[in-house]
Amino acid sequence: LQDIINEFGGAMPQTFGVPVEEIVRGIKMGVRKVNIDTDCRMRMTGQFRRIAEQNKAEFDPRKFLKPAMDAMRDLCKARLEAFGTAGHASKIKVIPMDDMAKRYASGSLAPKTN
């Protein structure tokens, strides 16, 4: 992801995230919270830069946004499949906003330590 940004004019210093394989291993060992926002932002940024470089006369932001969103969607899909979470949306129980507001107001969602 970083290489694409830099290939098309970016100047990101070398960074290292957690490889997908290690995240998958962590999930198998009980990790339940995984963040992929940085990867999503980097994927979109790389696509914006690629399009700007390859189409220097383009100024319509819609021409940048659609392929960038498609690239981010593809990255999310690949991550969700790798993490074993694809296809589970129907198992999520919707909680109405009013119910969540009551939970927050009652303090039942406040962090607790033992």
From Swiss-Prot:
GO biological process: glycolytic process; reductive pentose-phosphate cycle
Superkingdom assignment: Bacteria
EC annotation from Swiss-Prot or TrEMBL: 4.1.2.13
InterPro entries, A to Z: Aldolase_TIM (IPR013785), Class_II_FBP_aldolase (IPR050246), FBA_II (IPR000771)
Biochemical pathway: Carbohydrate biosynthesis; Calvin cycle; Carbohydrate degradation; glycolysis; D-glyceraldehyde 3-phosphate and glycerone phosphate from D-glucose: step 4/4
GO molecular function: fructose-bisphosphate aldolase activity; zinc ion binding
SUPFAM superfamilies (alphabetical): Aldolase
Pfam families: F_bP_aldolase (PF01116)
Entry's cofactor comment: Binds 2 Zn(2+) ions per subunit. One is catalytic and the other provides a structural contribution.
First-level EC class: lyase
Positions of dihydroxyacetone phosphate binding: N35, I36, D37, T38
Alphabetized UniProt keyword annotations: Calvin cycle, Glycolysis, Lyase, Zinc
Cofactor: Zn(2+)
Catalytic activity: beta-D-fructose 1,6-bisphosphate = D-glyceraldehyde 3-phosphate + dihydroxyacetone phosphate
Family affiliation: Belongs to the class II fructose-bisphosphate aldolase family.
Further comment found in the protein's record: This protein is encoded within the form II ribulose-bisphosphate carboxylase operon.
Subunit structure: Homodimer.
Role played: Catalyzes the aldol condensation of dihydroxyacetone phosphate (DHAP or glycerone-phosphate) with glyceraldehyde 3-phosphate (G3P) to form fructose 1,6-bisphosphate (FBP) in gluconeogenesis and the reverse reaction in glycolysis.
Protein name stated in the entry: Fructose-bisphosphate aldolase 2
Organism: Rhodobacter capsulatus (Rhodopseudomonas capsulata)
